[in-house]
Structures are given as structure tokens and as C-alpha cells.
């Protein structure tokens, strides 16, 4: 935007709640990663109020689930959560703190996904063979996966995309029962009860895969309604980046650029041509000249 359209740009990073609040208050012009499915009512309320304009999909596929390292998955034919249910397979992922059981590294206990995974373990019958292990932090979860790959050891873990780690390791997502809203709603009631009252209140329920989410883009109405900004809004609407490419860029950002956003952007623009279809040719020429 700066080099191609001649605008001064200030990039701001932040967590979901304050960043979205700033957009609604017209303090931020554009957000390029909105986890819309986690914020449906909030987004729709603000669209109705006229405070924001939605600009389409940034990353088309954001998934969560249970993953196994590809070498182990290929060797033992592990494609579905049901394939994990045997003592032979569980031994591959032995939990040193729970003799006789395998370990699935899960979410952090403070995150809702930890309890979701706990319920799924029981519904799927995985709890007979595996612990739902709390890694303690997001960094420890990443380290458990990366460490397994480094040592050539089997990995069985909860994880999600897009992330930098997914750009560096080869994990296979295990199939689960297909996402069903009614099933998810039923399971959520059990999850919320456990969060409030502890695991002893578990009741039989159904379970299914996490919904596959698209990450979207949005602009403040103040910015989008200014006619002078139309070329930028048109560009933001046009661009969409495949999840695999986002993973690669995040891996570059974390490991090769030293956390430098501009270097990461230049690497993406230099090594991909997909972006040229998002902008007029004169803008593309200016961007190329700046690399």
C-alpha cells in the first residue's frame, strides 16, 4: 500500500479484543485477519450499526484438530481418530507420566479447546488409551511438536492453522465425524458445564470436528466510505492467500527474518506472483521497483 499506492502506513499488532474494539471505534482503518466465526454476533451487530465494512476472505481455511506426524501416520495407516484406538499405537506415543497410556499433547487448560478435547477424548474412546496432556503454555505446545520432529519421535497433538510451525513440520490431520452445528451445540453445553463445575460433571454427548474457519478482512466505515480510499479498498477485497503460503510466511517471519514484518513482506512479494493479479499493473511495477 505504501510503495504501490503512495500512502503512509502504520502497522499495528494486538490481540483480538482491543484490536476489534479499535476498529469499531474508527481508530483503526483496516484489519486483515478477523477470526469471524469466533465473533459472529459482534461482527454482525457492527455491520448492522454501520461501523464496519467486511472485505471478504483473507485466508480461506483455518483448521483445528488432532494431528500425527506424517512418517508415523504413513507407516501405520493413521487417518482417522478411530485408527488411534489400540494399545499398539498408543505405545508409540507413550506418556512417561502415565504408564500404559499414550500422550496426546492438548490445548492449555485455560483455553476452551482443552475442555473440548477432553470431551472429545471421552466421546471418541481415546481416553482409554491416551492422556489429554496440558503442555502449560503455547510455547511448550510448539516445543513438544518441534522437539518430536527434531528427535524423530512420533507426535500426537492438538494444533491449528495457519501458524509458523505448520510451515516447518509435516503433520497429518486426523479425520473426525464431520462438523454438525446441532452436535457442536450439544457438546458445547457439556464443555461449559465442565468448565464451571469440573470434569466429574461430564455427561454422554456427541462430538465432531472443529468448524473449518475462513479468516476475513474488514475496514472501518470511516475509511471505506472515503472515495479517495477506493483503490486501497479494492485491493484489500481482491487479495486472498492460501493457508499453506501463510504458514510459510509465518515460518519465515519467526525463523529467518527475526520477527521483521517488512522483510517477511518483501520475501513474499519476491517469491510469489499471485499478488500481481490483485493490483493494477502500474501499482505492481512500483512495488517491484521497491523490492
Predicted regions and their residues:
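Short, polar/charged alpha-helical segment
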Residues: 1-6, 119-121
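Pocket-flanking alpha-helical
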Residues: 14-50, 144-148, 164-169
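Ligand-binding "clamshell"
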Residues: 41-55, 152, 166-204
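C-terminal functional modules
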Residues: 223-224, 233-291
Amino acid at each position: 500500500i505504501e510503495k504501490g499506492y503512495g500512502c503512509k502506513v502504520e502497522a499495528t499488532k494486538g490481540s483480538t479484543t482491543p484490536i476489534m474494539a479499535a476498529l469499531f471505534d474508527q481508530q483503526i482503518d483496516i484489519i486483515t485477519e478477523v477470526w469471524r466465526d469466533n465473533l459472529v454476533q459482534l461482527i454482525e451487530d457492527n455491520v448492522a450499526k454501520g461501523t464496519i465494512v467486511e472485505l471478504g476472505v483473507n485466508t480461506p481455511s483455518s483448521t483445528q484438530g488432532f494431528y500425527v506426524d506424517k512418517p508415523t501416520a504413513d507407516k501405520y495407516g493413521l487417518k482417522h481418530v478411530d485408527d488411534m484406538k489400540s494399545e499398539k499405537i498408543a505405545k508409540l506415543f507413550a506418556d512417561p507420566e502415565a504408564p500404559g497410556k499414550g500422550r496426546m499433547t492438548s490445548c492449555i487448560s485455560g483455553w476452551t479447546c482443552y475442555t473440548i478435547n477432553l470431551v472429545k477424548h471421552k466421546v471418541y474412546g481415546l481416553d482409554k488409551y491416551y492422556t489429554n496432556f496440558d503442555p502449560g503454555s503455547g510455547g511448550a505446545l510448539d516445543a513438544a511438536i518441534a522437539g518430536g520432529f527434531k528427535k524423530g519421535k512420533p507426535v500426537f497433538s492438538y494444533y491449528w492453522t495457519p501458524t509458523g510451525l505448520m510451515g516447518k513440520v509435516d503433520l497429518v490431520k486426523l479425520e473426525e465425524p464431520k462438523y454438525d452445528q446441532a452436535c457442536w451445540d450439544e457438546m458445547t453445553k457439556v464443555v461449559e458445564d465442565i468448565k464451571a463445575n469440573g470434569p466429574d460433571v461430564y455427561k454422554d454427548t456427541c462430538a465432531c470436528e472443529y468448524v473449518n474457519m475462513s479468516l476475513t478482512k474488514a475496514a472501518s466505515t470511516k475509511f471505506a466510505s472515503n472515495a479517495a480510499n477506493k483503490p486501497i479498498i479494492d485491493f484489500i477485497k481482491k487479495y486472498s492467500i492460501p493457508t499453506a503460503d501463510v504458514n510459510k510466511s509465518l515460518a519465515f517471519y519467526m525463523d529467518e527474518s527475526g520477527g521483521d514484518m517488512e522483510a517477511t513482506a518483501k520475501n513474499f512479494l519476491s517469491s510469489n506472483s499471485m499478488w500481481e493479479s490483485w493490483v493494477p499493473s502500474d501499482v505492481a511495477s512500483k512495488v517491484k521497483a521497491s523490492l
